[in-house]
Regions:
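Non-heme di-metal
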Residues: 1-89
Length: 89
């Protein structure tokens, strides 16, 4: 089955000031929350002697962060200019 993706995922700010902005923000918040939980679980697994499980959980966390980044772009949480974004960090 072909991978599905947002048709507008590479357009920064596409959902900003639209009816979708709130839903996209909720998805961003959910994904970033999941990143924290997965990384916390990875730390716990590492401390308890399960490095392989920790590695899997870190991979899942990275995938959730990737999802969050799409939502951040859609809602215009970053600008088109990479250097302006870096200055604001």
């Amino acid at each position: 089955m072909k991978d599905l993706e947002f048709a507008i995922q590479d357009v920064i700010g596409e959902t900003k000031n639209t009816d979708l902005e709130r839903v996209v923000k909720q998805n961003f918040n959910g994904e970033t929350n999941e990143v924290g939980i997965y990384l916390a679980l990875a730390r716990l697994a590492q401390r308890q002697g399960y490095p392989e499980i920790a590695g899997v959980l870190k991979t899942i966390a990275w995938e959730e962060a990737e999802h969050a980044s799409v939502f951040a772009e859609l809602n215009g949480m970053i600008q088109e200019d990479i250097f302006e974004n870096i200055k604001q960090m």
